[in-house]
Amino acid sequence: MLFSEIPGQAAVKANLVNLVSSNRLSHALLLLGKEGSGALQLALALAQYVVCEKNKPGSANGESSLFGEPTQTTTFLQDSCGNCPSCKKAAGLIHPDIHYSFPTIVKKDGEKPKASDFIQEWRSFVDQTPFGNAYDWLQSIGAENKQGNITSNECEEIIRKLNLKSFESGYKILIQWMPEYLGLIGNKLLKLIEEPPPGTLLIFVAQDESKLLATILSRTQLVKINQLESKDIQEWLINKQAVPRDKAMSIAPLSQGNLREAFQLLHNSDENWEEILREWLNAIIKNGPAAQVKWVDENSKLGREKQKQFLAYFIHLLSCAVQIANVGKAPEIAENELDFANRLLRLAATEQLEAIVIELDRASYHIERNANPKILFMALTIKIYHIIQDKAVISIH
């Protein structure tokens, strides 16, 4: 993977390239970023950058190499070339010097699973679900209700692989995705992290710092990865996914900096959220209890992910309305959304809109924890009615 294929994160990309070109990259690196930040993609791009043949040294200059050994001069590119044999192998996840570790499951009693047992599934997952999370990965290998784990057997396999000589590049690279699944068994890797064989690069890719072993945290060079800007996701949708601009402008703010969520919204949502929201608001403020019950009955069947997407859409429009009221300037959103946001301002004062946002956030939290959707949306309907009941009754057309 090329750095240029990853949306946003310009500062992180420049930092990683600078760490390599200035010989300041630790042999143990921790990329820490929330779901959908592109942390795994940055790790893949870094590994490809390190093995890229166009970044190989030329003549001796007496300086230390990436791992403290004598090196030769080289002009480092700002990205891997993408065309040399090493880059092509790295892009296909088949480079013999780049190893992958990730949570696995036991498929049969007595098995001692290793990541290499699932390497074909891993390649398919990275290609088809590029910003998937651990749940997506485990479901793709048939986990269902089974817990994922990085096993003692896997740790031993990592140590064995990285003690072998490199095949082609001069480096041996491990990308371990979701080290949160290591547990205390991760202490088996401490000696490898502290005293790695020459030419070894360990890249840990994590989401939750609180679930990492303190002994691993203290022995790795930390690179924090922020959530993406809405404009970066919008540009990625338009330029890489060929999404029409209006649709990209709607999806980007709803994803809240999460590329996985943007991917889900793009591929899994065929609902007309604007029409559903219009029907709900008219039921609340104009049409009365019978219409409210009908709406709740219909939309409680949407499914948890779509219900969360719908609430996120409503929050997005409310936030835009509040921004228009407070700043006097509309955010960059689709024309139909701008019109809806202005109608919301006529429906309620900004304080009321902000109160509705709080209720929607709370409802989304409870949906995530499997609340009964019919009860939840009926209660939410009543709460929203009481928040705006002092306003004149109008229709949202």
Language-model features: locations:
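Conserved Walker B catalytic segment
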Residues: Y171-I173, W177-L201, D208
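Charged, glycine-rich active-site and insertion segments that engage polyanionic ligands
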Residues: M1-Q78, P85-S86, P198-L201, Q207-H397
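Clamp-loader machinery-focused feature within the broader ASCE/P-loop NTPase space
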Residues: L2-E5, Q9-L184
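Conserved adenine-binding aromatic site and its adjacent loop/helix in ATP-hydrolyzing domains
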Residues: R160, K191, S218
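Short, structurally constrained coil/turn elements
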Residues: G92-I94, P196, I216
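Secondary-structure boundary motif
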Residues: L164-F167, E195, N239
